[in-house]
Amino acid sequence: MNAAGGGSGSQAAGAAGGNSSLSHNALLATASGATTMPMAQLADGWLELESDPGLFTLLLKDFGCHDVQVEEVYDLQKPIESPYGFIFLFRWIEERRARRKIVETTAEIFVKDEEAISSIFFAQQVVPNSCATHALLSVLLNCNENNLQLGDTLSRLKVHTKGMSPENKGLAIGNTPELACAHNSHAMPQARRRLERTGAGVSSCRFTGEAFHFVSFVPINGQLFELDGLKPYPMNHGGWEDSEDWTDKFRRVMAERLGIATGEQDIRFNLMAVVPDRRIAITHKLKMLRTNQAIVSGTLQKLLKADEQGESGNGDSQRPDTPTTLLEPSAFTARDLQSLLKNLDTEIAINEQHLADENDRRHMFKVDASRRTHNYDKFICTFLSMLAHQGVLGELVSQHLLPSKKVSGQGAANRISKQSTTASAGGSTAGASAATPKTQQQQAAAAKNGKSPSKTPGRRRKGRNKCRKRK
């Protein structure tokens, strides 16, 4: 599902910045080395993005986080390997009854303790259309740094915003040049035209009655948190059992949430998982398999060589000592090692194909991004102008319009013919039904007089007239 997720700020970024004690120079310092941009252009120039895992993966790379990817989740029950967090895209309708039920449910789990809020990265969305970046950062900046390499930009942002209020963290995100440029570089041209029509600083989502909004679900200190930039506080859904994974708790929360949200048959939502780059795990597994392949192959060669020497009687017939190998030669026969080597070759081929598939996916992400962000307006206008200049545009338009007219004319003729046929058939049927009772009475009278009912009285009269003429 590719829905544009815009989201709305709780207030204009400029107004929020005026009330904030955080200086604009400090905000721009989070992106050292970046080109200076007007503050209004940074805060009010964010564009809507589509909900696409390929787009989000490339956006993470542009942020400087290279070892992460985003995958779309189609089945909640299917296990997901080592997710950092989940991003939930849902249809936002302020006045919807199901929305009020969700608000009433989540209000009970708000975390209002300032110390607890400052210990996690929770940013309020004060900049319109930035909820996609907010959702990604809510996952990445709450992960353990030992498991994830954030890159220079996100690392500086995390350090700089430590201890800030959620509002100031939202301003820091909206006024970081690298984040704004990376975000807008993946927007469609229609989003830019829509922003120019509505005007900067005016939300195109929340206050128009309907939108699509992103929220994040991440595990923090043994608790499942829901981070929504349009909410005043983060939400704590509680912990999970010792025998469970945090994704089991997430599945239960999502099942309940979707059950409430789909009460009015509205199932427009999308779920994505932020996971480690699959290519890293595949590459590591390939390296291990190739190492084992070399060990098994070397051990097999030594074993075959020792057997040949034993059979010829030349040299020592004892098995070779291979302390550098992981396999003990005496525990395996040559046939066992050959079978093991064959299995390793198969596993290597399978993982090489998986790695090639992942690389092809990344290539297609870039191709789709080029198609998505390219502005085709100039090409289309130039192409149509050239056709008009050559005098063939009108002919092409007529050729494409005539078939539809012919089809509509044929359809009308078929309808008239069908109506005429139906009317004729109806008249014949009425006449036959009117004559049927008289014919039945004549046949009944003939049967009563002992005469054959096969001939009608009219035919007998004709026969008598012919006889009289002959006489």
From Swiss-Prot:
Q: Which Gene3D superfamilies match?
A: 1.20.58.860, Peptidase C12, ubiquitin carboxyl-terminal hydrolase
What's the subunit arrangement here? Catalytic component of the polycomb repressive deubiquitinase (PR-DUB) complex, at least composed of caly/calypso, Asx and sba (MBD5/6 homolog). The PR-DUB complex associates with nucleosomes to mediate deubiquitination of histone H2AK118ub1 substrates; the association requires the positively charged C-terminal tail of caly, probably due to direct binding of DNA. Interacts (via ULD domain) with Asx (via DEUBAD domain); the interaction produces a stable heterodimer with a composite binding site for ubiquitin.
Start-end of Low complexity biased regions: 420-448
Q: One biological process GO term for this chain?
A: specification of segmental identity, abdomen
**Which family is this sequence assigned to?**
Belongs to the peptidase C12 family. BAP1 subfamily.
| Disordered: region residues | 412-471
The subcellular location is: Nucleus
Whether Transmembrane counts among this entry's keywords is: no
A Pfam family found in this protein is Peptidase_C12
The record lists the lineage as: Eukaryota, Metazoa, Ecdysozoa, Arthropoda, Hexapoda
A GO cellular component annotation in the UniProt record: chromatin
Listed A to Z, the keywords are: Chromatin regulator, Hydrolase, Nucleus, Protease, Thiol protease, Ubl conjugation pathway
Task: Identify this protein by name.
Answer: Ubiquitin carboxyl-terminal hydrolase calypso
Q: Which residues are responsible for catalysis?
A: 131, 213
Q: Which residues form the ULD domain?
A: 375-403
- Which residues are tagged with the site Important for enzyme activity? 228
Q: Which SUPFAM superfamilies match?
A: Cysteine proteinases (SSF54001)
**Organism's domain of life?**
Eukaryota
- Predominant subcellular localization, coarse grouping: nucleus
Region (Positively charged C-terminal tail required for binding nucleosomes) residue ranges read 405-471
Does the keyword field hold Membrane? no
The UniProt regions of compositional bias labelled Basic residues, in chain numbering, are 457-471
- Which gene is this protein's source? caly
| Marked site (Transition state stabilizer) residue numbers | 125
Q: What is its EC number?
A: 3.4.19.12
One annotated GO molecular function: chromatin binding
- What role is this protein assigned? Catalytic component of the polycomb repressive deubiquitinase (PR-DUB) complex, a complex that specifically mediates deubiquitination of histone H2A monoubiquitinated at 'Lys-119' (H2AK118ub1). Mediates bisymmetric organization of the PR-DUB complex and is involved in association with nucleosomes to mediate deubiquitination. Does not deubiquitinate monoubiquitinated histone H2B. Required to maintain the transcriptionally repressive state of homeotic genes throughout development. The PR-DUB complex has weak or no activity toward 'Lys-48'- and 'Lys-63'-linked polyubiquitin chains.
